[in-house]
Amino acid sequence: MAVDAKLIKELREITQAGMMDCKKALEASDNNIDNAIVWLRENGLAKAAKKTDRVAAEGIALAKENDQKIVILEVNSETDFVAKNEKFLSLVDEIANALLSSNASSLEEGLQVKTNSGLTIEQSLISATATIGEKIALRRFELVNKTSGSSVIYNHANKRVSTLLVFDNKLDSTDAYNVAMHVAAMAPKYINMDQIPDDFKNAEMHIIKEQAKDDAKLQAKPANVLENILKGKLSKRLAEVSLLDQLFVIDESFKVGDFLKSKHVSLVKMIRYEVGEGIEKVVTNFADEVAAQLK
């Protein structure tokens, strides 16, 4: 029986099992997802599969480099306690090294990269999930080839924020590091104003206009004056998310853009990972959690 590739993908997302295991499970279950999950559990993947419905919103972010490439990645766990575990930290480092030795360009490709242990990253994650007792997942990564310009990485001490920057020309390592640290601290969404999409601008202007409705002094101003004030507020808001328009945390007497211009370099790539961003955490009342375990 032919197996639908979409079903394989769906089963992998549910169980974190390997691609070929999912294919075999679907073949043995007549393409029935529920029966395929049972098949996987019956064939030794039950422990990992049972944990995949949990939310893994903790973990660490890491940026690492070798002579040719740089990788930035986020690996998630369910609790901060596990994220500080030496076995977990070693696993993340092993995954980073494997990715640096690969040409993977997508999460799907990355999961199939082999680590030094001989297992694929996907298999290593399944094994760690079963051993540690929490869902462990590679959420995302990006692999960047080094160029003739400068590149820099920054890993914050809490292991929750990492940045990767690439410049078009050579930049002093200390200066580059300071910019990378600024990106970690100030969390710009875009390199410059030109990168900000219209959807973001329109959404921000809508919020500004709604807020202005409750300001009697603003509403009393002539329409043209009010319009200019609102535009000014929007420009200020956009500057907050545009790296080059932010005041440099190292010296707030000038903007990041002015600093880079004085060094005759341009930033061509900016990546910032923060653990758990965009993941909705499930908050459980401790008493309820204990009661649930006693049932």
From Swiss-Prot:
Signal sequence extent: none
SUPFAM superfamilies named in the record: Elongation factor Ts (EF-Ts), dimerisation domain, UBA-like
Region (Involved in Mg(2+) ion dislocation from EF-Tu): 79-82
UniProt-recorded Gene Ontology molecular function terms: translation elongation factor activity
PROSITE patterns: EF_TS_1, EF_TS_2
InterPro entries: EF-Ts_dimer_sf (IPR036402), Transl_elong_EFTs/EF1B (IPR001816), Transl_elong_EFTs/EF1B_dimer (IPR014039), Transl_elong_Ts_CS (IPR018101), UBA-like_sf (IPR009060)
Keyword Cytoplasm attached: yes
Top-level taxon in the UniProt lineage: Bacteria
Gene Ontology cellular-component terms listed: cytoplasm
Swiss-Prot/TrEMBL keywords: Cytoplasm, Elongation factor, Protein biosynthesis
Subcellular location: Cytoplasm
Family: Belongs to the EF-Ts family.
Function: Associates with the EF-Tu.GDP complex and induces the exchange of GDP to GTP. It remains bound to the aminoacyl-tRNA.EF-Tu.GTP complex up to the GTP hydrolysis stage on the ribosome.
HAMAP family: EF_Ts
Protein name: Elongation factor Ts
Organism of this sequence: Mycoplasma capricolum subsp. capricolum (strain California kid / ATCC 27343 / NCTC 10154)
Lineage of the species this protein comes from: Bacteria, Bacillati, Mycoplasmatota, Mollicutes, Mycoplasmataceae
Gene name per UniProt: tsf
